[in-house]
Design a protein with these regions (language model features):
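Short low-complexity stretches enriched in small and charged residues
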Residues: 1-2, 33-34
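Short, surface-exposed ligand-recognition loops at beta-strand->loop->(often short) alpha-helix junctions
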Residues: 2-11
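Short, conserved beta-strand edge motifs with alternating hydrophobic and charged residues
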Residues: 5, 27-30
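A common structural junction motif
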Residues: 22-26, 55
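Helix-rich interaction surfaces within compact, conserved domain-sized segments
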Residues: 30-33, 39-81
Length: 81
């Protein structure tokens, strides 16, 4: 399962909210982190989050069973390995 971890701080909430709009994505919590999971690809559009670049590039705390195929000014895309 493709998994993305995002620290639970106010600046990162829009990232989690946008990820959660995909019906194939599940949002959970592990300690101080949001756990964003999907059986397939996870795509988060930066402009939809409203995040500035500094927050956008620092929101990624970790991944599991995934590989990052895009992390630029437009989107974050994780795919299963």
């Amino acid at each position: 399962m493709t998994t993305l971890f995002v620290l639970d701080v106010p600046e990162n909430i829009p990232v989690v909210d946008v990820a959660g709009t995909d019906p194939s994505v599940t949002i959970g919590k592990i300690g101080p982190y949001f756990e964003i999971t999907s059986d397939g690809t996870i795509v988060i559009d930066r402009r939809a989050t409203g995040c500035r670049h500094a927050v956008w590039y620092s929101c990624l705390a970790g991944i599991a069973d995934a590989r990052i195929v895009q992390h630029d000014k437009d989107a974050l895309r994780l795919e299963p390995p």
